[in-house]
Amino acid sequence: MENKNEKVEKFIQIGELAKKARVTPRTIKHYEDKGLLKPFKKTQGGFRLYQDDKVKLVERIRQLKKAGFSLREVKEMEEIDGIVEENIFEKVDDNELNKMIKFLQSQLIKTEERLNETIKVKKGLEEVIEFLKKRKRT
């Protein structure tokens, strides 16, 4: 009889991970090269196998890239996130915590600056649209 409390881990290959996360397999390999992602294991045939939950990680990386963060910044944020999720603060001294806080505060400032620039662009587009609508003959 099967134990209902046991979690059966599902593994997916690089193509399926890429498809689910809406990126290319080449992007997945690039993230691996940058240390952002690694396969759970490789088969004897050399196929990379990933845990199904890596889809969310790839989507988060893509989202942060789209928001203007470099892969280096994304990696640092993911490392901090891992410490928070695993609650392993006993392995981190106050000096390291201060570095993390400073880094995240600088990322927050950059995000606010990008957001303000995006709002300005949006307002400019809205003004041009309204101007053009007023010029229509019909």
What are these regions (language model features)?
Residues E2-E9, D53-T138:
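Arg/Lys-rich, alpha-helical DNA-contact motif
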Residues L17-A18, Y31, Y50:
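Append "Primarily bacterial transcriptional regulators
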Residues K10-T27:
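Polyanion-binding surface elements
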Residues K19, D33, E76:
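Alpha-helical residues within the helix-turn-helix
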Residues I28, E32, K65:
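DNA major-groove recognition helix of helix-turn-helix
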Residues K41-E59:
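Short helix-start
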